């Protein structure tokens, strides 16, 4: 099956798994997805993730979701830049998510970074998603 938006699919899997209170969800593996998950882990939104090879050339990401007192840490997770409408932002024009309580994940020349890391590195890029 061909997906037009693989990253959006992974974000939807995370959103659905957290609403169902699952401890783990799985998604097909890719470098971009792994980079986004690494940024979410650095910001404390997930416990961790691991790549599992199903067979030669086919891998999946096992994502460990995070809960605090039974409530999901991720309240909202939305795709911003989509295949049909890419959204780019200079670092000075990047708005804060919920007045700094949430983060944006950006694809920059220095890799996939959260908005906090991008501001520290003074680089802009494509706004992949927002997390709160």
Curated annotation (Swiss-Prot):
The keyword Transport does not apply. Signal peptide: none annotated. One of its GO terms (molecular function) is structural constituent of ribosome. GO terms for cellular component: ribonucleoprotein complex; ribosome. Belongs to the universal ribosomal protein uS8 family. One of the primary rRNA binding proteins, it binds directly to 16S rRNA central domain where it helps coordinate assembly of the platform of the 30S subunit. This is Small ribosomal subunit protein uS8. It comes from Gluconobacter oxydans (strain 621H).
């Amino acid at each position: 099956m061909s997906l037009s938006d693989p990253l959006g699919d992974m974000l939807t899997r995370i959103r659905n798994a957290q609403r169902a209170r699952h401890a783990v969800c799985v998604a097909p593996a890719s470098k971009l997805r792994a980079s986004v998950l690494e940024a979410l882990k650095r910001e404390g939104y997930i416990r961790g993730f691991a790549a599992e090879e199903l067979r030669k050339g086919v891998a999946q990401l096992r994502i460990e979701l995070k809960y605090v007192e039974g409530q999901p840490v991720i309240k909202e997770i939305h795709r911003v830049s989509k295949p049909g409408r890419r959204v780019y932002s200079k670092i000075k024009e990047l708005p804060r998510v919920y007045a700094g309580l949430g983060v944006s994940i950006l694809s920059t020349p220095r890799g996939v970074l959260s908005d906090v890391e991008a501001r520290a590195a003074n680089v802009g890029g494509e706004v992949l998603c927002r997390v709160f």
